[in-house]
Regions:
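HTH-adjacent hinge/linker in prokaryotic transcriptional regulators
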Residues: 2-7, 15-23, 27-30, 34-101, ...
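Conserved phosphate- and dinucleotide-binding cores of soluble alpha/beta proteins
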Residues: 2-25, 29-34, 44-45, 77, ...
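Short, active-site-adjacent cap segments at secondary-structure transitions
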Residues: 57-58, 102-105, 132-133, 182-184
Length: 193
């Protein structure tokens, strides 16, 4: 297991259970006590957890792990969702994407569509995610519109009054919205961070 994967697994445990003990890390991840301590120290240095005697607890000021740690979680499912979503996109379409790991994968799959080869008929992509805008801006067949706003460090999304001012003047044909959860009524949840 790579260092990144260990850190992601430890963050998952802490987010799900509220805390983790070094013995749990040793047992669950099959690492030495020294490796478990180093991993917790690294995550504490990044302010993702708060160290305790023999373990760590969730950082009370951080309710959402950074995007780089959420990317590998359920990667196969995200790829399947992304491929299905990208199949709905055609040259000339106007689409919207918010930030998140799944919508980042959707953007990557859109960029790989064989039908998007004519720069004269680009897809217009509206996003509030600077990481998605960065990846897509170099694509000749994608025109990128960024909403503006204040950057959220953990998700790379632009939010706030500036984004709220521009959104009413933008129209998209298809919106791919990444959320944290969905209930049986279709209501969604999203981190506020």
């Amino acid at each position: 297991m790579s260092r990144h994967d260990r850190h992601s697994a430890i963050l998952d445990i802490v987010m799900d259970e509220g805390s983790v003990h070094i013995d749990d890390i040793i047992t669950r991840l099959g690492v030495s006590a020294a490796t478990a301590r180093r991993d917790l120290d690294h995550l504490a240095d990044q302010q993702l957890v708060s160290r305790t005697r023999g373990g760590a607890i969730a950082n009370p000021t951080s309710t959402e792990p950074p995007l780089r740690y959420r990317t590998s979680k359920m990667a196969d499912e995200k790829t399947r969702i992304a491929k299905a979503a990208a199949a709905l996109v055609h040259p000339g379409d106007s689409i919207g994407l918010n930030g998140g790991t799944t919508t980042t994968e959707v953007a990557r799959e859109i960029a790989l569509l064989p039908a998007l080869t004519d720069p004269e008929v680009p897809v217009t992509l509206v996003t509030n995610a600077v990481n998605i805008a960065n990846e897509m801006a170099v694509r000749q067949c994608v025109r990128v519109v960024v909403t503006g706003g204040i950057a959220r460090a953990r998700s790379f999304e632009l939010t706030g009054p500036l984004a709220s001012l521009i959104l009413p003047s933008i129209s998209v044909g298809t919106l791919f919205l990444g959320v944290e959860g969905l209930d049986d009524r279709g209501a969604y949840t999203q981190h506020d961070g």
